[in-house]
């Protein structure tokens, strides 16, 4: 599997995936196996919704374990760019304001494996991140979004 996809992520993001993998393998997998055993005791498996639900959950857990193992195995840790501290890049937080008088927003740009917009982490493949990467504090940038274009000014990069 020489051409497996690489997954850029922060060290913290990789650790979070490793914790989830450990939980799925040591706790969740056992819980699901136990639920399957209990559901088998309910009789006819052809009309046993508890058994079907437990088997579906088992398939989901096993699929997630495989996905996590692949992402961890192919993780590329994002190193901090100390030579260009004011340039937007993977692993950095960027604060910008929508022009002419919009509100301030801050996002951390991460790899797709650890993106979580609700935690302020956006994928480097997102339209906003693609538009901002490579720009620096003070730059005005046109960002393409599903809702149309917006003009933003970068006010901070950390």
UniProtKB/Swiss-Prot annotation:
Keywords: Coiled coil, DNA-binding, Transcription, Transcription regulation
Keyword Transcription: yes
Coiled coil: 10-75
Family: Belongs to the GreA/GreB family.
Transmembrane stretches, start-end: none
Protein name, entry field: Transcription elongation factor GreA
Keyword Coiled coil among UniProt keywords: yes
Organism taxonomic ancestry: Bacteria, Bacillati, Bacillota, Bacilli, Bacillales
GO biological process, one term: regulation of DNA-templated transcription elongation
Its biological purpose: Necessary for efficient RNA polymerase transcription elongation past template-encoded arresting sites. The arresting sites in DNA have the property of trapping a certain fraction of elongating RNA polymerases that pass through, resulting in locked ternary complexes. Cleavage of the nascent transcript by cleavage factors such as GreA or GreB allows the resumption of elongation from the new 3'terminus. GreA releases sequences of 2 to 3 nucleotides.
A GO term, aspect molecular function: RNA polymerase binding
Organism listed in the record: Geobacillus thermodenitrificans (strain NG80-2)
InterPro entries: GreA/GreB_C_sf (IPR036953), TF_GreA/GreB_CS (IPR018151), Tscrpt_elong_fac_GreA (IPR006359), Tscrpt_elong_fac_GreA/B (IPR028624), Tscrpt_elong_fac_GreA/B_C (IPR001437), Tscrpt_elong_fac_GreA/B_fam (IPR023459), Tscrpt_elong_fac_GreA/B_N (IPR022691), Tscrpt_elong_fac_GreA/B_N_sf (IPR036805)
């Amino acid at each position: 599997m020489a051409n497996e996809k690489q997954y850029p992520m922060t060290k913290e993001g990789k650790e979070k995936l490793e914790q989830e993998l450990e939980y799925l393998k040591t706790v969740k997998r056992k819980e699901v196996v136990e639920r399957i055993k209990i559901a088998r005791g309910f009789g006819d498996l052809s009309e046993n919704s508890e058994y079907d639900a437990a088997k579906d959950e088992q398939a989901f857990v096993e699929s997630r374990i495989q996905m996590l193992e692949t992402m961890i195995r192919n993780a590329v840790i994002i190193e901090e760019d100390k030579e260009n501290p004011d340039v937007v890049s993977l692993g950095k937080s960027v604060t910008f304001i929508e022009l002419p008088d919009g509100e301030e927003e801050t996002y951390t740009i991460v790899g797709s494996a650890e993106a979580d917009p609700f935690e302020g982490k956006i994928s480097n493949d997102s339209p906003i991140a693609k538009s901002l990467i490579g720009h620096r504090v003070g730059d005005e940038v046109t960002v393409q979004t599903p809702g149309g274009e917006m003009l933003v000014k970068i006010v901070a990069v950390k």
